[in-house]
Structure formats: structure tokens, C-alpha cells
Amino acid sequence: MIRLQTPIIKETIHPKKTPTALNWLYPEKIIHNISSKALIDNIYSENYQHILVGLISLIEPWVYLHTNLKLIDNGHLPLIDDETIILISSGEYMIDYYYRIEVNKYGKQTDLFDKLLQSVNNSNKDFFDKYKNYFKISGIDFDLNINTSNTNRFEIIEKYVIESLVEILDKITDGLDAIYNYDNQRDVLLPIFNNNYNNDNVESIDIDYDLDLLKKVKTIMANPTFKFDKDLMFHPTKSLIMEARETNYRVFNDLGNQIDAIMKNSNNIMIFPYAYFLIKNVHGKNDYPNSSYKKFDNIIINQLNQYFIELSNGEIYSNYHKNAFFVDSINGFRSINHDLYLKRFNDFVPEENNNNAFYDTIKFPNITQVNNMEIIPSDSFYIYNQGKEVIDSIVEKKHNIVVNQSKAKATRSNTYIIDKDTIELNLSVVFKGLLFNNKPVVYPISSNIVTFEIERINSTNYVDNVNVPYQVLQIKNPKVTIKTYDRKTLINKLMKKLFDEDHFLPWYIPNYNQNIVKLLFLINLDKHEYIDFLKKLLQTQNKKELVDYSLYYCFDYQSYSFYNLIWIDPMTVDRYYEIQYLIKFIIIMDNILLLPDVSLRKILIDFNSSYGWYDPNVDLSSVKVSYQNFKNNLLNTLNELDDIYHNKSK
């Protein structure tokens, strides 16, 4: 179905972006974001987002099962020791989810903002009118975390994870296409989702790595001599017996003591792969009744079908909803009052050559109407270092899949690597009559529904990111169970993304204003003391009255994070963990802007280079004005949130 490169050979790019480059100021991505946001608003509105997330959560047991089976069938061990594959909901959907929980404390909710507006005085309604659109999401994001300590194992496991993911996404695109194609034809649609499989002989498809039996078996299989020990147990020869040592027999006995328990619990999806492994090693083939994995597939497909029926009950692809999606998209496109530019050749275009000759241009026609947009069948693609291929058998569908394993990014003198693979589920939309290099074309627009990110083991933050704890949430209406990061972790991850990933000056980051408002609003509902502290920090001249810190300057910053400039008392970091980057940023900027221009320019140029930007002629006055605007806007938002908090307390 999909032929992946193994091991993955990626192009590692060393970006040199410039803040005035056309492709940075007006990226093509704006088009796709507008369309994706309109899709979620009108097709997958609030209740159907939950159903969609429930449907996507069934990917985890499928991927766990089939990745393990592929490992075994290809001569590898199943997951061993602390190895895990965990699907965690993240990003905008979870921020919005946590936000709605707090809003619902005001009473039964009929509209996301109406009840909240009733709970505050009229002076605060301006806040919600001003920021209402900031809380709309443009896609649902998941982290698919593969945890292993071995680079070779990661490459092998990820290969089978993606193959398994594509297999179940193929089934999901079939279901979504059926809902689209047979809208208003219930007599045709319902038989497609009819459950023909029973639940007999399946104990559980819940993913739970804390099972005692599972941990014991994975620990035994992680023994360095396990291959020898396994052969000694199942296929003993005279030479094996002669070579065996006491430690081999110890592992032999440990595994032997667990065999009955493994086979007895093989109706649990977590244990089944290990029963499958034993059967294959004893018989060499899958002729034992419990060796059939289809029973688990059938349960997963049954549950998928239930979610498909719930989505179809909402008539999500009715003409009304499709038209609303097109209208919102068109209105968004009309709001663009400039050309959009695509990079043509290099990732870096020197500022002095920053003209249209270096870019492909995209422009909407003067008359933009609903009939310019259309949903059409499309192929699914695998994008890799040297090209792009159609994924076999997943063709001509209105919902398509894009697997991207093409590039990694290295900054900070190659000390900071961001290496992620992405898998997208999109609705295939085209715009007819869009001008590409001034010629009318039928232009594909990616309307994103779900994105999966796999952090690769080469990434600098791999260990920290894949080992972040998660929690299990139960959404009651509709009934959905999902894994997610706790609020503290989620907010900190998004803060880091805004302040210490693409650039150290956050106003260079797309959608910065929206994201900081969302995060501060969410924090305000739970920890208002953070709002008070940030207000004091912004308004206090001597920051050391509030924070014990030290600044460090050196001759070269090109391999550093901006936040290496400062040390802060660990107690302060612990107390204000979620907003630590914001605290550090304010203190650093307040101090370095007092330096002589020569020293300040040196710091900014070096850190531009460190983060992969090219700006040899840093405009110091522009940076100073931008920072002052940043502080003013931040303080205004904090004051607005403070007003809401105190009005709520009355």
C-alpha cells in the first residue's frame, strides 16, 4: 500500500529566513488555513469534533496491534522494555476543549460564548467580541509518540507504525467518502456501516501499558540474550544446550513461567502480540485458534462504524453545510488584499533580491464566488527526500492522505534539530480560476481535518517530548475517551513553540497574537495569580524586586537558545512553570535594549543566525518599537482578563 524508505534519509535544511521575505510575509499557507478553519467551523462543528476525535482515537489500538504483528512477521521482537506507541490529542482542539470546560462552569451552555457573555458585565463584552475568532480551530492535531531508546529500533518501529496508520486511515477515508457521497440516502448509507461482527472472545482493546503481565513479558524480551534463550526453549539443539549458561536458563524459566498467563489473556489486545509471537515460534505458522488478530480488527471496525453513523446523523456533508463552508472560505479569501507568494528555488532569498522574480505568485480573481470552489476526488501521496509518489490503492477519494517524511531542520550551529514526520487527513478541495503566475488554473487547496506528528529520535527534544505524561479524559456528550497532555504541559509546549522554536522574537511567529490571548485566557481561569504577576513584571522597573535572576553575555551566541542569556531562581521557574518563557523574555529584552547599539546589534544578529534567520542589517529602532507594542498589547490583554476575573468574583 505504501512503500517507505528504511532507514529514512532526509534532507536536513539550515534555514536562513528573512523577516521581510515575501514568502514569510505572505505564505501560501494562509490559503490552506482559511479553508481548514472554514471546514472545521461548518462541517465539523463542536459536537462533531468530539465524534471525530473519538473516531480517530480508535487508530491507537489498530496501530499498536498491527505494528507489533508486522514486527513479528518480519523477524523482529514486538515492543519490549519501556517501548510504547501512544496517540495523544494536542494543539488547538485541546486548548479549545479546556476552554469550554471552564466556560461550562457558568451553567448549561447553548452557545460557546453566549453563557459566558451573560456572566460578565457589559464592559467586558468587548473582550469576547474582540477575541471570539481567536478560539476557532483550523484542524485537529495528534502526537503519535514512539518511545524507544534504540535508534535502529525506532526506524523499524516507525516504518510499521506509518504503514499501519495508513491502513486504518484508508478505512476512515472510505467511511467519510461514503457519508459525503450518500448524504440524504440513509437506505444506502446505513447498510455500509452495518456491524456484521460480534464481540465474542475479545476482552479489551484499551491501550494500557501498566498491565503487570505486559511489563513482565516486555522486560524478559528486552534481555540481550533473549534470541538465544527463545531458541533454547522452543527449538533446542545439542549445540544450544552445550552453549547455554545459568543466565540463559534463568530467562528460559522466567518466560516459561509466563506462557500460561500470556495465552490465557490473549483476548486482551495488549497481550495478544506476545501470544502471537509465541505461537509463531512454536508452530512457525498461525494455525492456533487464538492466533487470529481479525477479532480485534472487527471490534475496531464496529466502533468506527458507530462513529460514522453518528457523523452521518448530523448530515455534515449536506448541501447546506458545504455551502456554508464555501461561503466562509470565500469571505476569508476576499479579505486578503495582497498577492501570496511561494518559494521557488532556495529556502533563502537575500533581502536585496527580494522581488517577484524569485517566487511563484498566487492571486485570487477579482470576482470570487462560491462556484469557484469544488470538492473533487484526489489521490493520496507519500512525500520523501527525493520526490513524491501516489500511495497505491488510495486513489480518487474526496478525503485524501499525505505522508511527509521529506525534511528535518537544523539550527543553532546544528545543535538544535527539529525532525518530525507528518501524516495529514484532508478534504480534497480545489479553487477554479485562481491565478498562478497570472494564469488561471484549477488550484488544489488542502482543507485539513486531522494532522498526526511523529517526533523522530534525531530531534533534540525527542526524549523530553515523547516521555511527557498524559491523562485520559472522558467526554460525556458524546461519549468519547481520549488521551491528552495535562493543561500545564500543553500550555508550556505551546509557549515554547511561540517563544523558542522558530524565532526568539515572538511577533515573527504566525498567529502569535491569537495564541498568546488563548493561552493567557486559559491560564487566567485556573491561575489568576499568573496574571497579577505578569502585570507587575511589566510595570516594575527593577525586575529583581520580583525575580532573582542573572544575565550572561558572551562573544558568540550562534549556537545558543535566547534563554541561555538568563538564569532564574529555580523556585520562580517552578512556581510559574507555564509562563516561564514569557517571564524570561520580558526580563532579557528589558535589559538588552539598554545596551549600547553596537552590543545590541551583535546580540540580535547572532541570535538571528542561531535560529535560522538572515537579517544582517537589523533595524534596532524597529525592534524597540515592536517590543514596546508587544508589552502594550500584552498589558492590555492582561488588564482585560483581570477585569473579567474580578467581575466574575463579585
UniProtKB/Swiss-Prot annotation:
* One Pfam family this sequence matches: DUF5851
UniProt entry keywords in alphabetical sequence: Virion
Cross-referenced InterPro entries: DUF5851
Where found in the cell?
Answer: Virion
Q: Which domain of life is it from?
A: Viruses
Look up the record and report any one GO term of the cellular component aspect.
virion component
Family recorded in the similarity comment: Belongs to the mimivirus L515/L516 family.
What's the protein called, per UniProt? Answer: Uncharacterized protein L516
Originating species:
Acanthamoeba polyphaga mimivirus (APMV)
